[in-house]
């Protein structure tokens, strides 16, 4: 036999099961869509939204209220359920109406239309006056019933706050805002002027650097021209030296083999690169000195074999 708050406990269990079903539906939908998710985050978000919608829409309180009425009837307190006799006549009709009302409440709550807005819309409506910009606010039957039941209160603190707002010294407020605006304007102008000065200095430094670079580039060009001229002069001088040596060589009474060997060495001199040309000249001079040294040794040996003595003068 059901006792005490068994119906309320079953309703609470059904609501909790609905929440778990909502979490499973959300996670399975994300998996089908191929979206990665954090289960704890989804659970927390769904719980927060579920609790908000169930509480704000009044569905939870509606279900728990009916369950409490049934529990009171089961516990022999039939008098407490008399106020619900209008909807207890047909349970099927009542179930369909409750389901539709709960769906509408959940839909409105999920769209951001909270309980305060729904109650105010149900208690008041606005009547437009033709030909005028003003309108008349009318109370509905629900508002009348709330007044009769003593469910309407006047917030004195709100009235006093409203009166204070109406007595604001707008002139002083405007002057304060004007001073703040002028101060802000001055700071902005100072920052702008400082930025302009800094930008001008940067431009001057940039132009100065460009001038220095231009001067250095001109100097580099001059050095390059001088270097090219010097290189051409050296190449010409090397060619002249080689020609002079070849002419002088032909005037000597040396054998043709010796002349040919020396000419080959002269022709091997690099006349394009002066550095290489100097190395080639050094090699030729070393060879000539070496040949002269061998000739002197041979001549010295002949003198000694002939019992002659040589001296340097």
Curated annotation (Swiss-Prot):
<dbReference type="GO" id="GO:0030430">
    <property type="term" value="C:host cell cytoplasm"/>
</dbReference>
<feature type="region of interest" description="Dimerization">
    <location>
        <begin position="150"/>
        <end position="206"/>
    </location>
</feature>
<keyword id="KW-0694">RNA-binding</keyword>
<protein>
    <recommendedName>
        <fullName>Non-structural protein 3</fullName>
    </recommendedName>
</protein>
<dbReference type="InterPro" id="IPR002873">
    <property type="entry name" value="Rotavirus_NSP3"/>
</dbReference>
<feature type="region of interest" description="Interaction with host ZC3H7B">
    <location>
        <begin position="170"/>
        <end position="234"/>
    </location>
</feature>
<keyword id="KW-0175">Coiled coil</keyword>
<feature type="region of interest" description="Interaction with host EIF4G1">
    <location>
        <begin position="208"/>
        <end position="313"/>
    </location>
</feature>
<feature type="region of interest" description="RNA-binding">
    <location>
        <begin position="1"/>
        <end position="149"/>
    </location>
</feature>
<dbReference type="GO" id="GO:0003723">
    <property type="term" value="F:RNA binding"/>
</dbReference>
<keyword id="KW-0945">Host-virus interaction</keyword>
<keyword id="KW-0810">Translation regulation</keyword>
<feature type="coiled-coil region">
    <location>
        <begin position="166"/>
        <end position="237"/>
    </location>
</feature>
<keyword id="KW-1035">Host cytoplasm</keyword>
<comment type="subunit">
    <text>Homodimer. Interacts (via the coiled-coil region) with host ZC3H7B (via LD motif). Interacts with host EIF4G1.</text>
</comment>
<dbReference type="GO" id="GO:0006417">
    <property type="term" value="P:regulation of translation"/>
</dbReference>
<dbReference type="InterPro" id="IPR042519">
    <property type="entry name" value="NSP3_N_rotavirus"/>
</dbReference>
<dbReference type="Pfam" id="PF01665">
    <property type="entry name" value="Rota_NSP3"/>
</dbReference>
<comment type="function">
    <text>Plays an important role in stimulating the translation of viral mRNAs. These mRNAs are capped but not polyadenylated, instead terminating in a conserved sequence 'GACC' at the 3' that is recognized by NSP3, which competes with host PABPC1 for EIF4G1 binding. The interaction between NSP3 and host EIF4G1 stabilizes the EIF4E-EIF4G1 interaction, thereby facilitating the initiation of capped mRNA translation.</text>
</comment>
<comment type="similarity">
    <text>Belongs to the rotavirus NSP3 family.</text>
</comment>
<dbReference type="InterPro" id="IPR036082">
    <property type="entry name" value="NSP3_sf"/>
</dbReference>
């Amino acid at each position: 036999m059901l006792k005490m708050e068994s119906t309320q406990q079953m309703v609470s269990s059904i609501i909790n099961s609905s929440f778990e079903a909502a979490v499973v539906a959300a996670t399975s939908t994300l998996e089908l869509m191929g979206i990665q998710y954090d289960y704890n985050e989804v659970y927390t978000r769904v719980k927060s939204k579920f609790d908000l919608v169930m509480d704000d829409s009044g569905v939870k309180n509606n279900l728990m209220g009916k369950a409490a009425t049934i529990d009171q009837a089961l516990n022999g307190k039939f008098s407490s359920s008399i106020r619900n006799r209008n909807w207890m006549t047909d349970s099927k009709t009542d179930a369909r109406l409750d389901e539709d009302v709960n769906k509408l409440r959940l839909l409105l709550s999920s769209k951001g239309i909270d309980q305060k807005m729904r109650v105010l819309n149900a208690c008041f409506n606005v009547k437009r006056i033709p030909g005028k910009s003003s309108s008349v606010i009318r109370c509905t039957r629900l508002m009348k019933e709330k007044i009769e039941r003593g469910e309407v209160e006047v917030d004195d603190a709100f009235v006093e706050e409203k009166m204070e707002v109406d007595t604001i010294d707008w002139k002083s407020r405007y002057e304060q805002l004007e001073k703040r605006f002028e101060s802000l304007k001055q700071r902005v102008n100072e920052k702008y002027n400082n930025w302009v000065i800094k930008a001008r200095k940067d431009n001057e430094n940039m132009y100065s650097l460009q001038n220095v670079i231009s001067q250095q580039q001109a100097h580099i060009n001059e050095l390059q021209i001088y270097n090219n001229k010097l290189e051409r002069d050296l190449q010409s001088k090397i060619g002249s030296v080689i020609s002079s040596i070849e002419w002088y060589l032909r005037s000597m009474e040396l054998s043709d083999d010796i002349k040919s060997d020396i000419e080959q060495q002269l022709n091997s001199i690099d006349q394009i690169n002066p550095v290489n040309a100097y190395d080639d000249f050094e090699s030729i001079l070393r060879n000539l000195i070496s040949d002269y040294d061998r000739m002197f040794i041979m001549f010295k040996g002949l003198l000694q074999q002939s019992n002659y003595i040589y001296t340097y003068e």
